[in-house]
Structure formats: C-alpha cells, structure tokens
Amino acid sequence: MDKYLKPELGKYRLSALSSVKLNSFIVELCNKYNYKKSYFNNILKVLKTSFRLATDVFGFIRYNPAMTLRLPKIEDEVEFEKHLYNQDEINTILERFKDDDVFTCAFITACYTGMRTGEVCSLTWDDIDFENRVINVKHTVYDKPDDGKGRWYMGTTKTKNGVRQIYMSPTLFQALINFKKKQQHLKKLYGSNYITYYFEDIIGKNGKLIESRIIENNGNVLHMNTANLVFTRPNGKYVGRNILNYPFKIIHNELGIEKCRFYDLRGSYATTNLRNGVEIRDVADILGHKYIETTENFYISSTEQNKKEVTTAFDKVMTSELINNIIKYEIAY
C-alpha cells in the first residue's frame, strides 16, 4: 500500500476517486511494472477491501468506486515464454490458412502493426483511414460470458498511450482494402441474413462513456451506432477473440509451432524493427508503451530511424511473394 497506493491515490479525497480514475490507475500500474498477474491481483484486493471498508463499515463514502474494478483483460506478458516468429513460420502459417480470409487478415494486421490481440479484434472500419493509410487504435475488446446481456464489450485501450495512430505499410494496406471488398461482397450475397451489430453505450454517473456492449440487431437499436466490425465471419457473425482459437490449435498441433500465441506477433514486430535500425522510442510509440523501459524489458534495443519508417522497415524484411499472393483478392462472380 505504501509503495503504490498512497503515492498515487493518497493525494485525493475519497469522494474524488471515481471508477474511471481508479481504472486508469490500475492499467497504468500494470503497464509500468513487469510483475506477475498474481502480484497485481493482490494490489487490486487491497484496493477493493479498502473501499469496501470505507463504504460499508465506516460510511466515509456512499458509493464504492472499486466495486467493479478488475485487471485489464490482456495477455500476461510476464508469465509466458515469448515466441519470436521467423519468416519461415509466418509463411507456413499463412500458407496453411490461405483459405481463411478472416484469420489471415487478422494475422497480417497483428504481424505488421504490433497491435495487442484485443486491439486487433476490436477494429472497426471507422478506425481505418484508407485515404491517409492510418489505423487509429482507440479501443480493445473483452468478454463477459456471465453477463447475460451480451458477451463482448468494447472498452478503452490499456493506457492513454494506447490511443495512437499506426501507419499502414503497403502490404497491410492492400490486405485490409481487399478484405473490405470481400466483406462488402459477402454482405450482398447474404442480404437480410447478414448479421449486423451495434454499440450499446454504457454511461457512468459522471456522464462519461465506460464501455460499449456489442449487441446483435434485435430490432431495438434505433439510437445505437452500427459497429462496422472488421473481423467477422463470412455471415457477419462476431466472435471477438475466439476467431483465433481454432487456428492456433492447428498451428500448435498440426504445424508443430508450439507455445506460440497471437500476442507474440507483437514482440516479433518490435524485435524485427529494432534489429533493423528503428529507434526504440518510435517502436514504443507504435506499441502504445508509455515508458521506453517497458519496451526495453521485453524487446531488443537498437539505433535511430524515423517513426513513420517503422512499418516500411518491417515490410521490407518480412514481406514475401507468398504474402503478396495471399492478399490479392478478386471477386469471383
């Protein structure tokens, strides 16, 4: 408590500590320090217990802002051995899944941006600026299987630095624009049977957006925004991160690339760029790391380059004839 809670939260009155402020504190703490998940869980327990006592026992405040607090829904970088993908492995995976357009495009997106799993799976077409060749990373997706109102939710990125722009390399640009064409074609084919999703915004007491529930069209969506989700099944069905489950069983068992995760594409992206002369500050910005130390702890340092060249450097190293063939798409009428 003395090391983390008092220095950051002790300067506020209890009544001034909202759920949003406590959540920001937790995600920033997780981003800054490279401890195991169990360690952060202990900090969270102390925080929740303190506010429960302040509310229920002592009556210092009427509302408990820590009641629904939880750790960020992200992969635990510390507890897993990282896998550094090489070009042969990437080519093998893309060759095996060349007929699975959704997984292939999601894989290439993570491979060429270093985005977190939840950030990739939360992408909407509104986030992708094809004119300026930029991806606007603004949110992440997580599930609440026991919620009963809708499993998948869209929330803010891990930290404020998680909100960022990533320039698309030529390879990624072509992959995404062709995938969008295919999705539009499938919408026409399925017609009224194509599944459409909407965002049901959940607003806090302070009037600020907490998160958005992703719901299927149920006829009661007049005042909701269309989700325009990128990575959906051919019929429009959205399954969040589960889009990756079956392919990775094949990758582990059939292809023999064991102990690798979708998330490891993030580390592979960073390490490949750093080894090829990209400045670590630029890589940290692309990854959404607030502190360079976070990048240094997981990846290999290197020398200077321009931030916008990060995507181009990776493109030159990793793009093969196979990838170029896979991202080509022509609608078959």
Task: Outline where the language-model segments fall.
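Short, polar N-cap/turn motifs at the start of nucleic acid-interacting alpha helices
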Residues: D127-V134, E258, V278-F298, K308, ...
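Catalytic-site neighborhood detector that most strongly recognizes the C-terminal catalytic loop/helix
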Residues: D76, L84, V141, L287-T312
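DNA breakage-rejoining catalytic core of tyrosine-based enzymes
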Residues: S15, I61-Y63, K73-E95, N136-K138, ...
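C-terminal secondary-structure termini that scaffold catalytic or DNA-interacting sites
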Residues: N132, D143-P145, K149-V163, P170-L172, ...
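Short, charged phosphate-coordinating catalytic segments
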Residues: R52-P65, I90, I108-V141, R281
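Active-site/catalytic core of tyrosine-dependent DNA strand-transfer enzymes
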Residues: S169-I257
